[in-house]
Amino acid sequence: MPRKGPAPKRPVIIDPVYGSPLVTSLINKVLLNGKRSTAERIVYGAMEGLREKTGNDPIITLKRALENIKPTLEVKSRRVGGATYQVPIEVKPGRANTLALRWLVGYSRARREKTMTERLLNELLDASNGLGAAVKKREDTHKMAESNKAFAHYRW
């Protein structure tokens, strides 16, 4: 076990175009093989598409989409005796944000549209309307936690 304690949280650099740390986090999740300019082009293209399709600030739509994706409960495996139980636990706000962004980008990549910009744009639109695979993932996670509520007393 490490003796130095937990690593300090590093501050997220604010995005120069939209002035939002959320956009920076989204760019970092889209990033592959260190190609930041490509990731920025994808995210900024999706944000401009949001502005055109919704007619309002893309940051508001992004926040609404993330609120619809963020889980409040998840399950963690806990071994008791010879059995492993799926114990429901509450998700901390930072982890909820991270999971929401991870699911959003992951399910965007799995979509069928031609470019990643289109995939991200459509997944964001679906999520902001309460639809899409990322929102379904949140519902499945909550359902799993709900069905294992009997093991909540094993929480640590």
Swiss-Prot record:
Gene Ontology process terms (BP): translation
Keywords, ordered alphabetically: Ribonucleoprotein, Ribosomal protein, RNA-binding, rRNA-binding, tRNA-binding
GO cellular component: small ribosomal subunit
Keyword Ribosomal protein applies: yes
GO terms assigned for molecular function: rRNA binding; structural constituent of ribosome; tRNA binding
One Pfam family per UniProt: Ribosomal_S7
UniProt-listed CDD domains: uS7_Bacteria
InterPro entries the record matches: Ribosomal_uS7, Ribosomal_uS7_bac/org-type, Ribosomal_uS7_CS, Ribosomal_uS7_dom, Ribosomal_uS7_dom_sf
Keyword Ribonucleoprotein in annotation: yes
Purpose of the protein: One of the primary rRNA binding proteins, it binds directly to 16S rRNA where it nucleates assembly of the head domain of the 30S subunit. Is located at the subunit interface close to the decoding center, probably blocks exit of the E-site tRNA.
Family to which the UniProt record says this protein belongs: Belongs to the universal ribosomal protein uS7 family.
Subunit structure as annotated in this protein's UniProt entry: Part of the 30S ribosomal subunit. Contacts proteins S9 and S11.
This protein's name: Small ribosomal subunit protein uS7
Organism: Streptomyces avermitilis (strain ATCC 31267 / DSM 46492 / JCM 5070 / NBRC 14893 / NCIMB 12804 / NRRL 8165 / MA-4680)
Gene responsible for this protein: rpsG
